[in-house]
């Protein structure tokens, strides 16, 4: 049974909003000391950020003069976007951190007036100043056909094991944590029933997408259910929480919309829900124990086809494609159009 977690060692995060007023009174200079930012510093910074966000007031935050703020892949000034509209954090907030890269992330849920949404936040901290802020916010309001899945923010809870530390003797290396996450994305791309990159799952590994439950992850992959994914590109593993055994990434899943009917590996005939070019932008985390992915959580938002984040350093331009190749539509003729005119306003011969 999954319950809302409240761990004593997470007191700084879970109490962050209850002490929001006190946080907002903390001078920015007190947070902006010249030394580096360790794990507790990063997670405290995230708690301060959440409090400032809910107060619609970034002034107490130690923001870099060169701060970049991106929400749903669009670069904005801060405050703007949901900084202006958030009315409540439903939570519970799940915080992860990576002192080696100065990154801290939060998975939570919010209300904007009466509109619920799932929110993933990424902060980059250098010299105890926030230099980058990134949000992915998914709500029912911004869904269009085919919709990204979305669950109920009031009843959703995180898998409590995601936040638990892994015993030191059982911890995986950064490279191994990233390799499992990358194997997942490689399996999701052109999904044909094969597991790629050495990725491994428990029989009951479950994925939550915008709070909606998708159980038996490996079974879905073995069936080739996600064959419509042409590419999973611009994968950026920006945060590895080695203490908790979690790798987190940003990526984009491209759908060209050419695949129509296809067969699962068990022979079941099905049809792709993607009928035109579009992409999904995602922030996704993977809990890994002993080289096995045990839990997955993601926040998705629909984007224009082949969109990328302003933070993407080296954009991918690979062709992608499905195996076997999809037959392109038959050639057709142009529809009727208005007459072509010359400079005198007369119909031109053509």
Spans of model-derived segments:
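Bacterial N-terminal signal peptides
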Residues: 15-27
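C-terminal and inter-domain tail/linker signature
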Residues: 31-350
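Bacterial N-terminal signal peptides that target proteins for export
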Residues: 2-18
